[in-house]
Structures are given as C-alpha cells and as structure tokens.
Amino acid sequence: MSVETQKETLGFQTEVKQLLHLMIHSLYSNKEIFLRELISNASDAADKLRFEALANPELLEGGAELKIRVSFDKEANTVTLEDNGIGMSREDVVTHLGTIAKSGTADFLKNLSGDQKKDSHLIGQFGVGFYSAFIVADKVDVYSRRAGQPASEGVHWSSKGEGEFDVATIDKPERGTRIVLHLKKGEEEFADGWRLRNVIKKYSDHIALPIELPKEFHGEEAEKPAEPEWETVNRASALWTRPRAEVKDEEYQEFYKHVAHDFENPLSWSHNKVEGKLEYTSLLYVPGRAPFDLYHREAPRGLKLYVQRVFIMDQADEFLPLYLRFIKGVVDSNDLSLNVSREILQKDPVIDSMKSALTKRVLDMLEKLAKNEPEQYKTFWKNFGQVLKEGPAEDFGNKEKIAGLLRFASTGGDSGEQSVALADYIGRMKEGQDKIYYLTGESYSQVKNSPHLEVFRKKGIEVLLLTDRIDEWLMSYLPDFDGKSFVDVARGDLDLGSLDSEEDKKAQEEVAKSKEGLIERLKKVLDEQASEVRVSHRLTDSPAILAIGEQDLGLQMRQILEASGQKVPESKPIFEINPQHPLIEKLDAEPDEDRFGELSHILFDQAALAAGDSLKDPGAYVRRLNKLLVELSA
C-alpha cells in the first residue's frame, strides 16, 4: 500500500455511535446479513457508475465489465469485498461513513422492536447497511477511489467501530471500493469459501452483477495457481428478464427484500412482459408491512427504473399514482431513451400509458389477493387500507375498482374489524333497500353506540361504520357503488324510502303535527345553537340527536381543516327530538319557560356529546346539570 498523506482522525456523529453500539451488542442473532448489505451497496455503486457513464463514458476508464469480488484469508482472519463501481472521494467517505441523515437514524432507532431477527433486517431499509460490518468485525478498512479522479486521490478509511475513524489520502490505481473486514475472535466461520458461497446464494443470487469468489482447489488440484482464478457464484442476470416459469417463489421473495430493503416476504407480486405498441417489463410487489414513512406524502417512493437493463434511477414515482405509493418493484422499458431524466418522465406521453397499465395491474393483483387469499388481504388492509382510501379522489377512472377493494366495519359484527366489502354489504341488503347506509365518527365505540343507528337496528338494516380520519373526505368522492348511492345516516332528513311502510310515514306526519307547539318553543330557545328543530324519524330510545345539514361539513372534515390551520365555515347542526321519549313529553309539559330553556340546553349538549362533538361551553352544561340534580334531590 502506498504512503498515506493528509491523515486525520474524526469522531463519529452521535447517532452513528448509538447505531454501532446497537450493531455490536444487539444484532448478533443473524450475523450473515452483513454480507448481503455490503453486496447490495456494491451493486448500487455499479448501478450509479453505469448511469453516470451514459453522459460521461470516460468514467469507465476502459473497464466496462462491472463485478463484485469476495475473498478471504484464513490466516489473517479477514474477509474482503471489492467492487469496480462508482467509488468514493474523500468527502464522500467522511459524509457516508461518518454520519447518517438524522431523520433516517431517528426513525431507525424508533422502529426497533427488540426482536433481534427483525431488527437486524431494518438496517438496510434505513440506509445504514455498511455498519452491519461491525457485527462480525472488530476493525474495518475501506479503500476507495471515485471514478474519474486521479489515482493519487484514493482514500483509506479505517475504524474499530468505537467512537472515531481515521481517514487518509492514498494512491489507488483502480476505481471502486475495497472493504476489508478484520473478523472478531469467534467469527472465523466467515473466512471460509463454502460459508461465503452459501450466504451469497441465499441472499444475493438475484443481483444482476457477477459476484465472484476465488476458485478453491482440493486433493490433487491442491497446487494453487500463482494468481487466483475467480468463479461467478450467483446467477448474475436481472431476475425480471427471466421467464416467469423459471423463477422460483423464493427467488422472487429474495429479490423483493433487495429492492425494498425489507426483511419480510411480500404478500403478493406480479411479473409481466408487455410487447406491442409499448415494450416494457414490470415486477411489482405488495409489501407485507407498512414502511415507517408511509403517511409522509413527500417521502421518497416509486419504482426502480431501468431502460434496456441499464439502471436509470431509484424512486421513479411517475409510474404509479400516489395512493399506490407502497408498491415496490422495477420497471424496465425499451421505449425510453437512456438519457431520460425526471423532468422528461413528467412530460412523456409513453409514461402516462405505462402508468395507466401498471395501476390497473396493481389493482388486479389486489383483487386477486382479496379473492384468493382473504387472510393475506386482511394483513394488506391493516397496513395500507388508509392509503388506498385516497384512491377515489385521485383516480376517478378506477374509482369503482378501488371502491371494490375497500373494507369497512359495520353493525353486522361486534369486533370493529374493517372486513366488510361493499359487494358483501350489497349482497346482504334488505328487500326494498336501494342505498348503502354509513355513519362516520371518531372511534368504533362512539359510532356503534350512536343514537343515529337506533331506527336501523330496529329494522335490521346494516350500517357501515367509518372511523378513519380520512373517511368523510373519502365519501365525498364516492357517491355510489354498483348503482347504489351512499347515504350518511347522520346527514339531512333521513328517508328510508320503501323500507318505511305507508303506515309508518302517516304516523310520523301525525306525530310531527302534534308536536308543532313544542318545536316552536325549542326553536326560540335554541336559535343560536341549531339551524333547525324537527321531529326525528331516526330515534327509538334516545330523547334527542344532532343531524348535519345536507351541505354542511361533518365532524371529521371540520377537525381535519382545523388541524391544518384552515378556516372552517360556520354551520349549525339540526336538533331532532324523539316525540315518544318520556323526557321530551316532560319537556313539552313544562310550563316554566326558564326551566324549559335550561332543560332544552341540557338535551342539546347531551346530543352533541353523543355525536362525538365537544361542547362550546362545558362550564354552562355542568352548571345546568348540577342545578337539575339539586332540584331532583330536594
């Protein structure tokens, strides 16, 4: 090794120290993953070189054959991994190997579960895979030179994973990165060709780059040649280019883990080659769990884009709509040019056609999963259901298809589990029912006990219970499904159509007429709180209820707007009374107008609480209630 110059010792960023401590002391149950992570990084380095060399072929320095070499030295107890990819400059080394993006680290540490096997796989997802080397090594040396820089600008990084690292400038004639792991005592098993070969086959067979090991000679062949002979130990072909019939499920699963930096198997995948007007291959995966940043709409997302097997970019987000941002995979196009950029992707009509086809492909895959593997679909819904609910607003063309994939809780069950498909609901509709009834609210316990459901329980009509914050917004984009319109049971004047008999309707009219005097008194007292007072057709057990005006915002939408700092339009609820309830009868008979007013306000506030709303003046409610209790106990 050449003379080192400009040598300096630097301290690790605090988060890196935490991470190293974790790697060394916690993630030792699945040690072999260090090799998977380092190979994955080397593969990325080769992808980056290929991409940059499209615009600047000199970067290849005459060596366009990219590969990864893994070797070992039993006597020195070392494992060496070398690639001829893009390499790193001194600045890159200090940045990438001494610090981690704070957001990534914080999220990494937050996501640790204490389960060693799961935690060991999290490291790739958060871009900290390099540090897994310290699981098996007590010292790591990195020698690197960035493609395009002179040989004199190589860099040597070295650390024992304790609190600091050394960095020095060296001569390095060949571009790329060489990592030497000085194995800890007790980790000698990895300085072995057979062991390394098995780990590579297990985790990295799908890597499209040849991964080479030195050929081993045994018995009569034991005379080793002066120069090692290298042999490729992985398939080294892009998995998506192979015919589906030739790819085993296990290979698809391992490739997913590489692409998604995930440790769990995917729930489903779809591998397709499209020929004709457009030519491209796609391999799309539905993950088995939600990533930590699923609800950050600005978080990186998208597919890996290749053009004619050449890697172009990670996170190409133009191929799928935002509501499918959880889908992972690759798309390899023959129609795009090799110098394609993000700006071009946004304008190219070819992309629109591909996006439309890939979106349909994903929705078909989800339909198939729901139909053939309902338990797996339950897992999918638990992880990604709320994101899929963004679909009807974003993708009008596929609204009906997306609606068929949605799942809801309903009054038909007791668990609150979101397992009811709209098609199932329609299949159970009562004779004469032509609408899909639903109720939105803050929580399952609140909506299942809502007074709004009383008449539906009495008539045995199923009601969907929607408690996700996005639900009211979703329903504003979903007016109907399969020809049946949706009706919010808490909104407007409830009309059950033919589910109410003519006798029912006649009786309702007569009762409303008999209570006209009471309605007028209530209107006067509640003029500032209620937009309207009327007799209710919804109630069988409760004295009163609040309904939402046909054009007014519901509670969920008001809360979303308030939380985002937007102005919420002023609106008053409709106050409905149950004329047969003893409290309403007593109220009607109350001659003292002051006491009538106090009791009316108590009933109004109780109805607001039952609807999940907060009181504008809780103190006044408590004062009135206490006064009433004193009167009753006198």
From Swiss-Prot:
Cleavable signal peptide: none
Chain residue ranges for the region called A: 1-342
Entry keyword Nucleotide-binding: yes
A molecular function GO annotation: unfolded protein binding
Keywords, in A-Z order: ATP-binding, Chaperone, Cytoplasm, Nucleotide-binding, Stress response
Short name of any one Pfam family annotated for the protein: HSP90
Region (B): 343-559
One GO cellular component term: cytoplasm
Location(s), subcellular: Cytoplasm
UniProt region (C), positions on chain: 560-634
Family affiliation: Belongs to the heat shock protein 90 family.
Record's function text: Molecular chaperone. Has ATPase activity.
UniProt xrefs under HAMAP family: HSP90
Binding partners and assembly: Homodimer.
UniProt-recorded name of the protein: Chaperone protein HtpG
Species classification: Bacteria, Pseudomonadati, Pseudomonadota, Gammaproteobacteria, Pseudomonadales
UniProt gene name: htpG
